């Protein structure tokens, strides 16, 4: 347990909210079951960012699903990371891809997918989806299959 506490600096401490995009707040911990394929899903219904052109707020539900390998993302750090987009200007599609790439850098998962379900603006809903499967593995094939059969 001491080793786990050393890996995670945010749990049980006063929360400092970053005012702009802050990938450095993401933390990972060791997966105790890396030999198993299993899903971890985060549903984040209060995501906000800013339109990079108008500065108007955008609201979304972000869904993150992944198959962990050696590392897993710590949920409080993920919450703070997603909160850091609040004053960040990025298009919906960029937000989803940035989130996915940052989590890949952090954890190197076997597979990951991120969906943004953005609240309509101007009468149009945008639901960007991005995924990744580790190259040269069955997860790469899985990513291709899921992308080609997405909705």
From Swiss-Prot:
Single GO term (MF): preQ1 synthase activity
General function of this protein: Catalyzes the NADPH-dependent reduction of 7-cyano-7-deazaguanine (preQ0) to 7-aminomethyl-7-deazaguanine (preQ1).
Listed Gene3D superfamilies: 3.30.1130.10
HAMAP family in alphabetical order: QueF_type1 (MF_00818)
Organism: Bacteroides fragilis (strain YCH46)
The reaction(s) this protein catalyses: 7-aminomethyl-7-carbaguanine + 2 NADP(+) = 7-cyano-7-deazaguanine + 2 NADPH + 3 H(+)
Name under which the protein is recorded: NADPH-dependent 7-cyano-7-deazaguanine reductase
InterPro entries: GTP-CH-I_C/QueF, NADPH_dep_7-cyano-7-deazaG_red, QueF, QueF_type1
Record bears the keyword NADP: yes
EC primary class: oxidoreductase
Gene Ontology, cellular component aspect: cytoplasm
Residues annotated as binding substrate: 73-75, 92-93
Pfam families: QueF (PF14489)
Subcellular location: Cytoplasm
The protein's Enzyme Commission number: 1.7.1.13
Location of the active site: 51, 58
GO BP: queuosine biosynthetic process; tRNA modification
Tree of life domain: Bacteria
Upper lineage: Bacteria, Pseudomonadati, Bacteroidota, Bacteroidia, Bacteroidales
Keyword vocabulary terms for this entry: Cytoplasm, NADP, Oxidoreductase, Queuosine biosynthesis
Keyword NADP: yes
